[in-house]
Amino acid sequence: IYSGEIMYIQDEVAAQNLPFSLEYVIPEEGTNVWLDSWVVPKNAKNKENAEKWINFLCRPDVAVKNFEYITYATPNKAAKEMLDEEIQNNKAVFPDAKQLKNCEVYRYLGDEADELYNSLWKEVKSD
């Protein structure tokens, strides 16, 4: 499952009264930090409306509704405070600083590194 789907899976299992035997783990060595972003291209024809859309999504009441719909963590602190305490403390949804200490945002390192990565990944996946 993907990181943001853990909450959805937990809810489905609980609704069906099934035993839950999955644990969400971030390796101690770290991993990539997951994020989705809204951006406005510099040559956008309707920059003002795009900014209004982003501002709308950043409203705490809207961010909570978005969280409830997609069950992916919200970075909006005011929205997070509006969630049930059990959800706020769910480390699978909102990892703490200790869990994120060794995590990083992946960045493109150029064609040579990309080719090496893909080659190594194919080797790992091979029989």
Predicted regions span which residues?
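Conserved C-terminal helix/tail region of periplasmic/extracytoplasmic solute-binding proteins
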Residues: 97-127
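A general structural signal for well-ordered alpha-helical packing
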Residues: 3-6, 37, 50
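Ligand-binding pocket segment of bilobal, Venus flytrap-like solute-binding proteins
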Residues: 1-27
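Mature extracytoplasmic/periplasmic domains
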Residues: 41-101
